[in-house]
């Protein structure tokens, strides 16, 4: 009786806990913008803020003068009370580029572009176990097909993809542009990247991850895994750019900047956690990693002998920024959170679902990526993906800030004073976590309290019976 009670009660409790941290009823930024523009007071403040951001870019208009800066700050403070300030986007949504443009226009700092860049995407809060429950595991599928040889999981995953209409459709859609030669080039890289993004956005994770994160025991399998994204077109180039230059290029594009911020947020390592991930969620890390594929920051396996990944870049010609460059590159290459997530998927395992993930207490700075604060002249306009200003600050996410500060109140962002002053940013630019989008409430909802109470009572009755 006791085990039966747990069997039915624990999934319900896990579902409710996931709902508690999902962010509530936040609007996507497109809907929030439309809603704001219909309200006179919100519309006025929103237009003022957009003029402030545009003016700051060109050192013109409202951005000049103390009075103008006060007006800009007033507009931002007023918008904090609106749904627009707390809006998010969904990866692969119909108007994703427009949504991200609105999001970043809201989160541009007017005092040095140093706002903490949390992920612009609505949290998914999924689990690898959720993916495994969708259909039988890949090896189980092929137990029903006698003529298919066993042993190469990546080959099995590719064949499983061909048996699924959606996976087959989108895989064919990227194979064609990624392998077709165009004039003197190997392929049309732009079309290849777009098709790859659609593949990982549209195809169920069961199949796309099966090809990208399959577990291997031999070189033939690992090489097939490395070739999944057709790296000769989507990944490799004649020369490797400097990683910091590649990062700058990524930050000028709404999609790339957002996917990179999402990766830093969801794959942040933490050695004291059960999974080596700060957020204790392998599925979210793998989703964030796959989201980078099809951008200029496309990562891939470095070779066929390890799970180390990296973008196509190195740290040559870094000059005084060598340490910063290596920190950025090693976030990919030596990321224990990502490696554990890949291994967990390949093994069909997951972070212990029912174990409560208590915050890791630490007073030391959380390892973060080398995200440079730098203002650059604007490039030519015309692309809907282009971003006017492109800055990624040292913190990867709000949760890292909480771990560093050991509190959940109004603390300054986790930017070390040395790095902050080195970049020439004044102390007045500091903001508090309270000024950011409000984090999910840590309090239990009445519904959850009721369920927990009922569960406790039920368990007590089963023990006494």
Swiss-Prot record:
Gene3D superfamilies: GDNF binding domain
Sequence repeat coordinates: 25-113, 150-238, 239-342
Pfam families for this protein: GDNF
One of the record's GO cellular component terms: multivesicular body
Domain of life per record: Eukaryota
The family this protein is said to belong to: Belongs to the GDNFR family.
GO molecular-function term, one example from the UniProt record: neurotrophin receptor activity
Record-linked PANTHER family: GDNF FAMILY RECEPTOR ALPHA-1, GDNF RECEPTOR ALPHA
Database matches in SMART domains: GDNF
UniProt KW keywords: Cell membrane, Disease variant, Disulfide bond, Endosome, Glycoprotein, Golgi apparatus, GPI-anchor, Lipoprotein, Membrane, Receptor, Repeat, Signal
Description of how the protein assembles with itself and partners: Interacts with GDNF ligand and RET: forms a 2:2:2 ternary complex composed of GDNF ligand, GFRA1 and RET receptor. Interacts with SORL1, either alone or in complex with GDNF. Interaction between SORL1 and GFRA1 leads to GFRA1 internalization, but not degradation.
Signal peptide interval: 1-24
Residue positions of covalent lipid attachment, annotated as GPI-anchor amidated serine: 429
Residues excised as propeptide: 430-465
InterPro entries the UniProt entry points to: GDNF/GAS1, GDNF_alpha, GDNF_rcpt, GDNF_rcpt_A1, Glial_neurotroph_fac_rcpt_a1/2
Regions annotated as coiled coil: none
Primary localization class, coarse: membrane
Subcellular location: Cell membrane; Golgi apparatus, trans-Golgi network; Endosome; Endosome, Multivesicular body
The keyword Signal appears for this protein: yes
Any one GO BP annotation for this protein: male gonad development
Name this protein carries in UniProt: GDNF family receptor alpha-1
Disease field: Renal hypodysplasia/aplasia 4: An autosomal recessive, severe congenital anomaly of the kidney and urinary tract characterized by bilateral renal agenesis, and severely reduced or absent amniotic fluid during pregnancy. Patients exhibit the Potter sequence, including flattened nose, ear anomalies, and receding chin. Some affected individuals have limb contractures and joint dislocations. Bilateral renal agenesis is almost invariably fatal in utero or in the perinatal period.
Disulfide bonding pattern of the chain: 36-42, 154-214, 161-167, 178-192, 187-233, 216-221, 243-313, 250-256, 267-285, 277-337, 315-325
Glycosylation, residue list: 59, 347, 406
Function: Coreceptor for GDNF, a neurotrophic factor that enhances survival and morphological differentiation of dopaminergic neurons and increases their high-affinity dopamine uptake. GDNF-binding leads to autophosphorylation and activation of the RET receptor.
Membrane-topology descriptor: Lipid-anchor; GPI-anchor
């Amino acid at each position: 009786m006791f085990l039966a009670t747990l069997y039915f009660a624990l999934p319900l409790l896990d579902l409710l806990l996931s709902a508690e941290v999902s962010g509530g009823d936040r609007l996507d930024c497109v809907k929030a913008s439309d809603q704001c523009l219909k309200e006179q007071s919100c519309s006025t403040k929103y237009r003022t803020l957009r003029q402030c951001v545009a003016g700051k870019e060109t050192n013109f208009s409202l951005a000049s003068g103390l009075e103008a800066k006060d007006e800009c700050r007033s507009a931002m403070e007023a918008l904090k009370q609106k749904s627009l300030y707390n809006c998010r986007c969904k990866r692969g949504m119909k108007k994703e580029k427009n949504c991200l443009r609105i999001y970043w226009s809201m989160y541009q700092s007017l005092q040095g572009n140093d706002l903490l860049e949390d992920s612009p995407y609505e949290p998914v809060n999924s689990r690898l176990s959720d993916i495994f429950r969708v259909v039988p595991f890949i090896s189980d599928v092929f137990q029903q097909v006698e003529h298919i040889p066993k042993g190469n999981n990546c080959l099995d995953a590719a064949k499983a993809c061909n048996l699924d209409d959606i996976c087959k459709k989108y895989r064919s859609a990227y194979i064609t542009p990624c392998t077709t030669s165009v004039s003197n080039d190997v392929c049309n890289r732009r079309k290849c990247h777009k098709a790859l993004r659609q593949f990982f956005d549209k195809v169920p994770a069961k199949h796309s991850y099966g090809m990208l994160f399959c577990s291997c025991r031999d070189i033939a399998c690992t090489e097939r895994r490395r070739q999944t994204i057709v790296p000769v077109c989507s990944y490799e180039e004649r020369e490797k750019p400097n990683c910091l230059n590649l990062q700058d290029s990524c930050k000028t594009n709404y999609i790339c900047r957002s996917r990179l911020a999402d990766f830093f947020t969801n794959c942040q390592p933490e050695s004291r956690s059960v999974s080596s991930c700060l957020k204790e969620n392998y599925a979210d890390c793998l989703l964030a990693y796959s989201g980078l594929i099809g951008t200029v920051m496309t990562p891939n396996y470095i070779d066929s002998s390890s799970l180390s990944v990296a973008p196509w870049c190195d740290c040559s010609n870094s000059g005084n920024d060598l340490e910063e460059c290596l920190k950025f590159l090693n976030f990919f290459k030596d990321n224990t959170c990502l490696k554990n997530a890949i291994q967990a998927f390949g093994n069909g395992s997951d972070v212990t679902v029912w174990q409560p993930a208590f915050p890791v207490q630490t007073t030391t700075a959380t390892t973060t990526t080398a995200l440079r604060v730098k203002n650059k002249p604007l490039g030519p306009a015309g692309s809907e993906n282009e971003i006017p200003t492109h800055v990624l600050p040292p913190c990867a996410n709000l949760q890292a800030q909480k771990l560093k500060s050991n509190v959940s109140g109004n603390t300054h962002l986790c930017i070390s004073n040395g790095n902050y002053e080195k970049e020439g940013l004044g102390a007045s630019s500091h903001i508090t976590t309270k000024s950011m989008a409000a984090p999910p409430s840590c309090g239990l909802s009445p519904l959850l309290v009721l369920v927990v109470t009922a569960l406790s009572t039920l368990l007590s009755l089963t023990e006494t019976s």
